[in-house]
Amino acid sequence: CLTVDCYPGVDDEIFDLIKEIYKPDFVIKSEDVFYEKDELNKMMTPFLTEGRVRGVMYYGKMDDLIDDIKLAQYQSLASHKGRVLVYGVGASYIHKGDTLIYCDLACWEIQLRYRKGMPNFKQDNDDEDILKKIKRSFFIEWRIADKHKMDIFENIDYFLDSNQEGNPKIVTGNALRSALK
């Protein structure tokens, strides 16, 4: 099983590239284990104040936003025979993977993509005020994504930088961890 865990905002270009190279027999997209948009919005309401910019910092974790029933269903699917690809935000919750790739994206690049119309995670807010998109990311999405990245950091086999569209870069997890010492 190849698991590609992603920071929110990584686009389908990376998914398509990995599918082309890995040629999986079975694909699981991790986005499906998260609560649906309306439920997520209800959970996030206390942290997203009325103003365009100010909010309340969310101190929870990514798994707070994951539906345990869906997660269990997808975890059983990950034992499918053949080449399985588990891809997306929080993918390592579904399966740790025989190989774990973490696909990263800088917050600045995410802001640039928001300006081009990218929605927030599990939302359809393409045309929403850019400051509200950034507020949702700053107070909630980036917090949980950063915690999750640190939780799995020591287990990452390859670290993929997806900041430059059309030009992803990859380094081994060991090389990155050594460079950061």
Locate each region found by the language model.
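ATP-dependent small-molecule kinase phosphotransfer cores
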Residues: 24-83
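NTP-dependent small-molecule kinase module
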Residues: 1, 14-23, 116-119, 138-181
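Extended, regular secondary-structure scaffolds
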Residues: 106, 112-116, 123-145
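N-terminal active-site beta-alpha-beta segment that forms phosphate/nucleotide-binding
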Residues: 1-38
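Structural motif
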Residues: 4-9, 87-90, 163
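ATP-dependent NMP and nucleoside kinases share a basic, alpha-helical "lid"
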Residues: 21-22, 71-124
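Hydrophobic/aromatic beta-strand patches that form the interior of the parallel beta-sheet core
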Residues: 2, 26-28, 85, 99-102, ...
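Catalytic cores of nucleic-acid editing and processing enzymes
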Residues: 18-28, 73-77, 89-91, 129-132, ...
